[in-house]
Regions:
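Active-site catalytic microenvironments in core metabolic enzymes, especially phosphate/sugar-handling
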Residues: 1-259
Length: 259
């Protein structure tokens, strides 16, 4: 499989074209020397494209690095300083960079939010959480009602060493319904959607000081898993799918930010 064929493979289920309002340049961000000729033998997966993940991809012998947070956003201008440090390993080592942002948050069943929902064993799943006119989250009902503490434990069950960034138990003692928006979904407008839909708990990645009193006054349980940890889910699900359906080797590069 070549890089361009791999691009078509990812697009066949990640539905990148459905999220054109995304600020990320999704898809191939840095090509290799022969996108129609060079055979892809190994793809590494990571949450962030940065100097460290790029160097680790080089060390792992990767042909492609697939990330949730790529390098090309509207604010990227010149390739200098830290931007150069991030980009140069790809060019020097003929490694391609592939990014998938909001499509990977929203994807069912390979995205961050649905992946967390499956981990929680949520039922009756429905799209939830509008951003720029795009629904990128999910909501559902717990098969077995849980306390806040139990919900946190299950959410972090895949990595016992990763602790939640913030837990605000301001809602019902027994939780039956949950809304999920991974990553940076801690704004008041994000949380309001969970409140207005009468959800018992809201799970996201980050926590914002400015939302604290709104959460408390609205009487909802709020869990911030950590931006990084909440978005390790999708890249690993895509890696698993790729390894099961092709002969391409995969490897997850874990570079936690503890944020």
């Amino acid at each position: 499989m070549t890089l361009n064929e791999l691009d078509l493979y990812f697009r066949s289920f990640l539905k990148i074209e459905d999220y054109l309002m995304d600020v990320s340049k999704n898809g191939i961000q840095i090509q290799n020397s022969s996108p129609n000729g060079k055979q892809i033998k190994k793809v590494c997966f990571a949450v962030d494209a940065c100097a460290e993940t790029a160097e680790k991809a080089v060390q792992a012998g990767a042909d492609v690095l697939f990330v949730h947070h790529g390098l090309f956003w509207p604010e990227i201008g010149t390739i200098t300083d830290s931007v150069y440090k991030r980009i140069s390993p790809f060019i020097k080592n003929d490694i391609a960079l592939y990014a998938c942002h909001i499509p990977l948050d929203a994807n069912n069943p390979y995205g961050n939010n649905y992946g967390i929902a499956f981990r929680l064993n949520l039922k009756n799943l429905k799209p939830f959480g509008e951003w720029r006119g795009m629904l990128c989250g999910v909501k559902g009902e717990l098969e077995k009602p849980l306390t806040v503490e139990e919900l946190v434990e299950v959410a972090h069950s895949h990595n016992k060493n990763e602790k939640p960034l913030c837990v605000l138990p301001f809602g019902k003692k027994i939780i039956k319904t949950v809304g999920i928006i991974s990553g940076g979904g801690a704004g008041e407008d994000d949380i309001r959607q969970a409140v207005e839909q009468n959800l018992d708990a809201y799970i996201t990645g980050e926590a914002e000081h400015s939302s604290y009193h709104y959460i408390k006054e609205s009487g909802i349980n709020f869990i911030a898993m950590g931006h990084y940890y909440s978005e390790t889910v999708g890249v690993q699900l895509v890696a698993k799918k790729l390894s099961e359906e092709t002969d391409i080797q995969t490897e997850f590069i874990d570079v936690p930010t503890n944020l």
